[in-house]
Amino acid sequence: MVSFCELCGAEADLHCAADSAFLCRSCDAKFHASNFLFARHFRRVICPNCKSLTQNFVSGPLLPWPPRTTCCSESSSSSCCSSLDCVSSSELSSTTRDVNRARGRENRVNAKAVAVTVADGIFVNWCGKLGLNRDLTNAVVSYASLALAVETRPRATKRVFLAAAFWFGVKNTTTWQNLKKVEDVTGVSAGMIRAVESKLARAMTQQLRRWRVDSEEGWAENDNV
């Protein structure tokens, strides 16, 4: 199974257990070069042929590429590839089951709407773990869902995007802003949350500008009628 980069959506080349993230070579180099501690993370190389996680590890901000790997499909006597690891959680398992069920009834339910509903359920669950009251939960979920809506990537329901959108909602609706607790609740590293949340925030700003321009143009057309 092909895994995709959590930051850009391209095919992933490595998996970082410390960040619970799949990354392509380019994003891995940028992200792990941004901080001395990040650079020390060990990342597992993904076999370019069978797409499984190998037993080859790399560390440091810059990598020689391609790394030396022996694909299990090339050698029947010895396999460098482990069984495919999946970064999962009870929330993501629930998301996958719900989306799969939606595919079986596409004539009645829009799969995108199902994904949004599942994401909202995950946000509510995380708010509960943070101890937020109903009003704050509604506000956080609204902002987080809006952040996901402006994200056009087809893999926007991945845990890293959910965590980033959730942090966006928490930042913009509460005075309680503890990224460490959000990290603990979501299972996504603070560094990954910050990196993706900043992209969501920029996308949100651009979308708000477009909405404002469209609204102003609409009022102008009405005035001319």
Curated annotation (Swiss-Prot):
Please give the InterPro entries that the UniProt record associates with this protein.
CONSTANS-like_Bbox1, Znf_B-box
Q: Name one GO molecular function term.
A: zinc ion binding
CDD domains xref list:
Bbox1_BBX-like
Its transmembrane ranges are none
Instruction: List the SMART domains hit by this protein, alphabetically.
Output: BBOX
Where are zinc fingers of the kind B box-type found along the chain?
5-46
- Compartments, as annotated in UniProt: Nucleus
Would you tell me the Gene Ontology cellular component terms?
cytoplasm; nucleus
What is one Gene Ontology biological process annotated in the Swiss-Prot or TrEMBL record?
red or far-red light signaling pathway
Q: Any idea which UniProt keywords this protein has?
A: Metal-binding, Nucleus, Repressor, Transcription, Transcription regulation, Zinc, Zinc-finger
Q: What does this protein do?
A: Repressor of light-mediated regulation of seedling development. Functions by suppressing the activities of positive cofactors like BBX21 and HY5 involved in modulating light-regulated gene expression and growth.
Its subunit composition reads: Interacts with BBX21.
Q: What is this protein called?
A: B-box zinc finger protein 32
Q: Which organism is it from?
A: Arabidopsis thaliana
